[in-house]
């Protein structure tokens, strides 16, 4: 019940912690956890997953309506289709050359110094 400095601590009277001497934690050290977990028991919530399965399934999963054939896309679309990339590149607009703009760029700091 007495601490290392000789004073009596009455706040922990009658508990298991009152009978053990205090360890000096020091700077940056956390107090040890008092909860003990059995080795065979995992800390995960795996058991909670089994409980969720017994509940009602979501309404979205039960949507077993017939598929509308007008929404189904038939045909190979782009599969097994030869694509001429050279022709596709000609159809695209030409890209602007940005290298010229880079030469003209002067950061704000350098503009003020001049």
Swiss-Prot record:
**InterPro entries per record:** Histone_chaperone_domain_CHZ
Composition-biased stretches, type Basic and acidic residues, lie in 24-40
Where are the compositionally biased (Acidic residues) regions? 41-68, 93-114
Q: Does the keyword Chaperone apply?
A: yes
The coiled-coil regions, if any, are: none
Ranges of Polar residues composition bias in the record: 1-22
Name of this chain's protein:
Histone H2A.Z-specific chaperone chz-1
Record organism: Neurospora crassa (strain ATCC 24698 / 74-OR23-1A / CBS 708.71 / DSM 1257 / FGSC 987)
List the lineage, top down: Eukaryota, Fungi, Dikarya, Ascomycota, Pezizomycotina
This protein's encoding gene: chz-1
């Amino acid at each position: 019940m007495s601490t290392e400095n000789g004073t009596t601590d009455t706040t922990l009277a009658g508990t298991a912690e009152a009978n053990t001497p205090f360890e000096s934690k020091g700077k940056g050290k956390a107090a040890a956890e008092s909860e003990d977990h059995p080795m065979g028991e995992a800390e995960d919530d795996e058991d909670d997953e089994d409980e969720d399965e017994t509940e009602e399934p979501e309404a979205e999963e039960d949507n077993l309506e017939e598929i509308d054939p007008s929404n189904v896309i038939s045909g190979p679309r782009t599969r097994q289709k030869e694509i001429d990339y050279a022709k596709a590149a000609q159809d695209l607009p030409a890209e602007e050359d940005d290298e010229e703009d880079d030469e003209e760029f002067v950061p704000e700091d350098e503009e003020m110094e001049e």
